């Protein structure tokens, strides 16, 4: 019997850690992929390593990219301040085409591994309004994946799974806690320091804090 494999995008944050735990619970052999893309919050990479180890993934890859060479985002260009108050429209923390790039590389690895499922922790309920977190984007990428690959053309097919898509942050936290995720290991803050401590002010910090509060669970986040 063939092993059921999945490639999972793992940023080191709360959502992606939960997705790894969910995939493992569903019986997948988990292969996780993180990206060192020039992000200001590089502490998330150490968090991803910790999560991958805690959840006993088969293999964890860190891919180097130079998205700060493109810029255009507060996460990759330190001359753009990370907003510390809610904003209208798509915020400056949006990284141009990031999820398209990340999923494309995950797709390549999945094809090599013979994995047919790719998991991503995007969410369209408690989220920052990024266009590449919407269900329409996920569905469109899946169609493209099955048109653009040898495996897809030969009928083996890929599925892009976004199991958090319609969950609130509180629901995500409760689910991950039940599955044994140690959220103290994760880093969500857009401007976390080198030790992984959070600012408590950015959009990601606010969503995370509200999720734990609504879930009625202790927030293990460390702040600077």
From Swiss-Prot:
> Its function?
Catalyzes the ATP-dependent conversion of 7-carboxy-7-deazaguanine (CDG) to 7-cyano-7-deazaguanine (preQ(0)).
Q: Which NCBIfam families does the entry link to?
A: 7-cyano-7-deazaguanine synthase QueC
Signal sequence segment: none
Functional pathway: Purine metabolism; 7-cyano-7-deazaguanine biosynthesis
Q: Which InterPro entries match?
A: QueC (IPR018317), Rossmann-like_a/b/a_fold (IPR014729)
- Reaction catalysed by this chain? 7-carboxy-7-deazaguanine + NH4(+) + ATP = 7-cyano-7-deazaguanine + ADP + phosphate + H2O + H(+)
| The protein's name | 7-cyano-7-deazaguanine synthase
**Cofactor: how bound:** Binds 1 zinc ion per subunit.
Hey, which family's this protein in? Answer: Belongs to the QueC family.
One Pfam annotation, family name? QueC
Say if the entry is tagged with keyword Zinc. Answer: yes
The highest taxon in the source lineage is: Bacteria
Q: Which PANTHER family match?
A: 7-CYANO-7-DEAZAGUANINE SYNTHASE
Q: What class of enzyme is it?
A: ligase
Query: Which UniProt key words apply to this protein?
Result: ATP-binding, Ligase, Metal-binding, Nucleotide-binding, Queuosine biosynthesis, Zinc
Which Enzyme Commission number(s) are listed? 6.3.4.20
Listed binding positions for Zn(2+) are 189, 199, 202, 205
The record's GO molecular-function terms, alphabetically, read: ATP binding; ligase activity, forming carbon-nitrogen bonds; zinc ion binding
Tell me which Gene Ontology terms the entry assigns under biological process: queuosine biosynthetic process
């Amino acid at each position: 019997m063939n092993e059921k494999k999945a490639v999972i995008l793992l940023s080191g944050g709360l959502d992606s850690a939960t997705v790894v735990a969910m995939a493992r619970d569903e019986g997948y052999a988990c292969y996780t992929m993180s990206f060192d893309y020039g992000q200001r919050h590089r502490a998330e990479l150490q968090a991803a390593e910790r999560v991958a180890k805690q959840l006993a993934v088969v293999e964890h890859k860190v891919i180097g990219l130079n998205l700060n060479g493109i810029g255009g985002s507060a996460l990759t260009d330190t001359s753009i301040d990370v907003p510390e108050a809610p904003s209208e429209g798509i915020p400056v923390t949006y990284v141009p085409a990031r999820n398209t790039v990340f999923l494309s590389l995950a797709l390549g690895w999945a094809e090599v591994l013979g994995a047919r499922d790719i998991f991503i922790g995007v969410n369209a309920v408690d989220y920052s309004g990024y266009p590449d977190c919407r269900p329409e984007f996920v569905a469109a990428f899946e169609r493209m994946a099955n048109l653009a690959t040898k495996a897809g053309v030969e009928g083996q097919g890929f599925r892009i799974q976004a199991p958090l898509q319609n969950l609130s942050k509180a629901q995500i936290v409760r689910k991950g806690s039940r599955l044994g995720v140690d959220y103290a290991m994760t880093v969500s803050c857009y401007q976390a320091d080198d030790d992984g401590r959070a600012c408590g002010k950015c959009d990601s910090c606010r969503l995370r804090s509200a999720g734990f509060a609504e879930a009625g669970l202790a927030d293990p986040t460390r702040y600077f």
